[in-house]
Amino acid sequence: MASELIEQKLALLPSQPGSYQMKDKNGKIIYVGKAKNLKNRVRSYFKAEHTGKTAELVANIHDFEFIVTNSDKEAFLLENTLIKRYRPYFNIRLKFSGSYPYIEITNERDPRLILANTLKHDHGTYFGPYPNVYAASETLHFLEMTYPLRRCNGYQGRPCLYYSMGQCLGACWRTVPQEEYQKNIDAITRFLNGETGKAISDIKKKMKRASDSTEYELAADFRDRLKFIDQTVESQRVLQNDHTPRDLFNFYMDKGWMTIEIFFLRQGRLLRQQKETLALADSVKEELESYIQQFYSQKNAQKPKEVLVPKNVDTKLLAETLEIPVRTPVRGEKRDLLKLAAKNARITLEDKFRLMELNEEKTTGAMKEITDALKIPHGYRFEAFDHSNTQGSNYVSALVVFEDGLPNKNLYRRYKLRTPTGQDEAKATFEVITRRYTRLRDEGQMYPDLILMDGGEIQLHSAEAALRKLDIDIPVAAMVKNDKHQTADLLNSRGENLFLDPHSQGFYLLQRIQDEVHRFVITFHRQLRTKTNLSSRLDEIAGIGPKSRVKLMRRFGSLPKIADASIEDIEALGIGEKVATLVKVSVSAMVKSENKKIIAKRKFEKE
């Protein structure tokens, strides 16, 4: 049931297009949507029954805001802008790899054919993307043999090896006329646009001439080129006599989840496919339209000449915002491909459900055991902290993030503590919690469902104090270890030790989180200690000032690497020959001394 505040705001909603932003109890935006009629759309969240992720969204809405726009198109574009800005938890979060390769004809006096990972504004001509590096490399190799441009590094006064093999036009030893380059560039362009007839005809003629001249090895080479075209181009054709670059989107939805399948059609072929499975927080139509809009707003996204979508999608609105034709095929090959994409999406989603059933007990089920023990709402994201120091110096903290029971290492963070703490765990905790959640608050990012502190009551209460000062409400618990430094108890905010069955998945997850945050902070502390030790040892060498010390640390990183470097390598950093020689001799002596100590220690341990 909607709160009094929400009921009052619902009554004020206009019947106009716009974007709406749902907020949680901390005032953070958790969902952004668009509407042709704000009044009808926003009211639907609170005046109807919902299931799945939509029900979870509504349960977390404590307030909302809206922005009226002049048109549906403006609302669509505004929604996309706000999603990118706030990254709301309940909106689709795209996972593009951006790693598909392209073939580029470079914009140079003597052009080359190269593989490119991204599209650049360098006036080169790009073809692709290709499904993988192997496919792109094979095509590139075929073109280099059939329609050579430049493969060498440029003029060197003599023909290069590639020229003698017929794979370079000779920029290595002569000025190649632009007409020669253009002839082959035109042929390459035709081939990569799917016009293979001319290439097949040319190669067949060359193969016949080679065979008639009894150059059977050369004839076999031409035969292999024909086989390449047949296997990689013609046999993969799914649209006959249609070379228009198209992207095709379809979906399958079940149990509050949706899988989106994308087919990339180039030169009449299904070049590659991409799929993504998402929990629905809105209608399928709204989610799919939002996904497509976000898809083409990503960095390096290449728009095709046309986009194909299933029925009930607002093709007119998408076409206006994407500024390319968007349509729904109703018959023929394109309609068949749309059905094929839906079939693939269904298989993907059904496979996901089977995997979810297998993994739920170990992941989300384990998280639920922990939240149930703490008597807090079930969540999907835990953040854990630990500290490390050397007798009060080099004090560091580290954060690990577990989502749905699994570590998300992209979200891990390391902190050098700024305030003097000595060995005061409370001060260290207060600082790192303040820094972490001030940033999340200021950037409008999603808070975790639970904070776990490695330690006991000191760390727990200090974390709670920091959150109270920030006026942020996040549950906190502590992971307590026994005298054998093993996970023993879960401590709640009231200082109570909560029992978790040591054989349960929840206890096992707690162990993994505690071990992971400890590993991460210790690794960081060792790196920092090594760096500090290196810095102090370099300070012992006469003639090495702060600037030279920093250069040596950045370039080599450790004493053994400096000892292995030549005097010339050290001089290359802008250090004079006399000081460079002194550095080499001094550091070599230090390393030799350290090695003797290590050998003596090992010998002692063996005895």
Swiss-Prot record:
HAMAP family on file: UvrC (MF_00203)
Family: Belongs to the UvrC family.
Pfam short name (any one): GIY-YIG
GO CC annotation, single: excinuclease repair complex
Start and end residues of each UVR domain: 197-232
Cell location: Cytoplasm
PROSITE patterns: GIY_YIG (PS50164), UVR (PS50151), UVRC (PS50165)
Record domain GIY-YIG: where: 15-92
Subunit structure: Interacts with UvrB in an incision complex.
Keyword annotations: Cytoplasm, DNA damage, DNA excision, DNA repair, Excision nuclease, SOS response
GO BP term (any one): SOS response
Keyword S-adenosyl-L-methionine: no
Main function: The UvrABC repair system catalyzes the recognition and processing of DNA lesions. UvrC both incises the 5' and 3' sides of the lesion. The N-terminal half is responsible for the 3' incision and the C-terminal half is responsible for the 5' incision.
GO MF: DNA binding; excinuclease ABC activity
PANTHER family given in the database record: UVRABC SYSTEM PROTEIN C, UVRC/OXIDOREDUCTASE
Coiled-coil stretches noted in the UniProt entry, renumbered to this chain: none
Broad class of where this protein is predominantly found: cytoplasm
InterPro entries, alphabetized: GIY-YIG_endonuc, GIY-YIG_endonuc_sf, GIY-YIG_UvrC_Cho, RuvA_2-like, UVR_dom, UVR_dom_sf, UvrABC_protein_C, UvrC
UniProt key word DNA repair: yes
NCBIfam families listed in its UniProt record: uvrC (TIGR00194)
Protein name: UvrABC system protein C
